[in-house]
Amino acid sequence: MKETLARTDFRLPGQKAVYHGKVRDVYTLENDLLVMIATDRISAFDVVLPAGIPYKGQVLNQIAAHYLDATRDIVPNWKIATPDPMVTIGHRCEPFKVEMVIRGYITGSAWRAYAAGERVLCGLPLPEGMRENQRFEHPIITPTTKADEGHDENISRQEIIAQGLVSKEDYEQIERYTYALFERGTQMAAEKGLILVDTKYEFGKKDGKIYLIDEIHTPDSSRYFYAEGYQERFERGEAQKQLSKEFVRQWLIENGFQGKPGQQIPKMTEAYCDSVSERYIELYERVVGKPFEKADLSNLAERIEKNITEYLR
């Protein structure tokens, strides 16, 4: 089997803390620096799956870095450097306790709720007669609370402000940033023959200033459809050809797993993991518009620790 990076346990210069998220390992250093390592872990339905996906961490880290650089004129972001294909180092910000999900089309969990009869999503009324994968007249923001453990919950703009999760002034600013980032992401995707269907952004504050943090426009935080054939598939009521993690979710559903108690995660064979890896690489090449350069997979953890340590010297 190809080597994958499941988890890191480094002792980095100036290290104060480490947090192992669903797919990232995040080290807090002195001087308000963060080291974010995109591992090859993969999660779906808020569960980390048992097998790693070769090159997934590199794909996520490099797509995010590409888009952070391409949107810096819209909003300041946390990224300072990428000393390794799987690592980003940046400013530690105090994250807002909400994630800004923005949708240009009705699909995924929003469609599942709509199909079950719900007509209000995060406080927003939805029109009757919508069909799966239909474009909204205007993109809609459907925020979620940010859960450290377990499931993120939908929440409305009014509730966020009323509960004091984010001040009204800050919320209005991150809302403006969210629309502007989605517009830029939509334009950049269109140039590559893709539709940015929906995505999520996270923001934080440092020294009173709002920053875009974490990853953006990656297959883990976004859905992309192929633009070619979208309309025909939509009119025929067929599934869209998409580049996202949705194909993993669909495979799990078909194999009887949706993250519910008592359900068993199906066995992920080496061939299956390789096929997921190929989808991620294809996504990188489509989204970034450049060939993917596979980093050496031997001694991954050693290489990463060396590159981080050399950068921090």
UniProtKB/Swiss-Prot annotation:
The keyword Magnesium does not apply. Gene3D superfamilies: ATP-grasp fold, B domain (3.30.470.20), Phosphorylase Kinase, domain 1 (3.30.200.20). GO terms for molecular function: ATP binding; phosphoribosylaminoimidazolesuccinocarboxamide synthase activity. The lineage of its organism: Bacteria, Pseudomonadati, Bacteroidota, Bacteroidia, Bacteroidales. It is an enzyme of class 6 (ligase). Keywords: ATP-binding, Ligase, Nucleotide-binding, Purine biosynthesis. Belongs to the SAICAR synthetase family. It catalyses: 5-amino-1-(5-phospho-D-ribosyl)imidazole-4-carboxylate + L-aspartate + ATP = (2S)-2-[5-amino-1-(5-phospho-beta-D-ribosyl)imidazole-4-carboxamido]succinate + ADP + phosphate + 2 H(+). Pathway: Purine metabolism; IMP biosynthesis via de novo pathway; 5-amino-1-(5-phospho-D-ribosyl)imidazole-4-carboxamide from 5-amino-1-(5-phospho-D-ribosyl)imidazole-4-carboxylate: step 1/2. Its EC number is 6.3.2.6. One of its GO terms (cellular component) is cytoplasm. One of its GO terms (biological process) is 'de novo' IMP biosynthetic process. This is Phosphoribosylaminoimidazole-succinocarboxamide synthase. Pfam families: SAICAR_synt (PF01259).
